[in-house]
Each structure stands twice: as C-alpha cells, then as structure tokens.
Amino acid sequence: MKYLLRVVTLTCMVMAGVGAWVSPGYGEPYELSKNDVMDTKTLKSADISLFGVKLGDSEAKALDSLVNEKIPGVKVEQEASFIFLLDQRKPTGPMAGVRIQDGKVDLIFINNRFSYKTRGIFRNVLNSESPDDVRKLLGQEDYGDENVMGAILSYDKQGFVINYLGKDVNVEFSPLR
C-alpha cells in the first residue's frame, strides 16, 4: 500500500511538472515559430498561429500575447489596427504581424525578414528563389497572377496568399471564405 501511494504521488508530480513545462502555444496545430509542419494538403489558415495568436482571436488576446509578453529578439509596435513585429537587430520594417478589425484578428502576415524565426514549410516558402519554387512546396495555386515584377499566388481553399516580388516574399493568412 505504501509503495502504491509513492507511485501515485510520483506520477502526479511528474504529470504536474510536464504540464507546467509545456507552454500553451505548443497545443496549436501550426505555430509559425515552433512547429515543423511540412504537409501542405491539410494546412488551413485557421490552424496557423503567430506566437499563440490565431485568426479570430480577440484584440485583448493579441495584445497580451504580442505586446505584453516579451518575445526574444522582437520589437513590437502598434499602429492603427496593426500590431507589427520587427527584428530588433535590424528594425527596418515589420517582419510579421496581425491586423485587428471589429475586435478580432482577421489577418496574420509574415515576410522573408521573419524566415529566421519560422519553422516548417513556410521557412522554405520565405526563402524561395522563384514562384516555381513556391509551387513545388505548396502545389498549384487556386489562381494567381505572374508578370516580370513578381507573382501573386492565391491558395483560397487553404486561406493564404503568397506575394512574391523578387527577394521580397510575403505570406498573408486570412479566414477561409
């Protein structure tokens, strides 16, 4: 009986320790800065999160997660309806961010300045050399436009758009239509 009590107590302590160690952001299906998801077929914009903020989250949650919590190496600025994340090393422009409308997050964006913090398939997308490289990674777009200046590749069924302008690559995640 004494042995059983010790085992149960030890198990409870281990489970409590594991629960405290795993942060809430790890439960997201695809956290841009943490998960190495490579399967693009099941990827939807509703499953994407940026430092714990997902599409449809409240303004309060976005402010708490992005502004109030310190993110290493990231400078945060809030302008109008946007929360911009800038690289502290070279704060030349936003590398990622969210747009808030009607009290909810309705757009998450990342660009190639954010590639060093991105994991999984979108790191490869942000570092791609051409629109064809993006197509090899994500498959054929639903529709798009390509000219000498660059390309817009729209993956509406999955809820994101890739803007490819030479070395500048932007990914915008929005709610599915």
Residue ranges and their predicted role:
Residues 112-116, 174:
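Glyoxalase I/VOC metalloenzyme domain signal
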Residues 13-18:
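Hydrophobic h-region of N-terminal signal peptides that target proteins for export
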Residues 1-11:
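Bacterial N-terminal signal peptides that target proteins for export
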Residues 29-30, 57-104, 120, 124-177:
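A cross-family detector of function-defining hotspots
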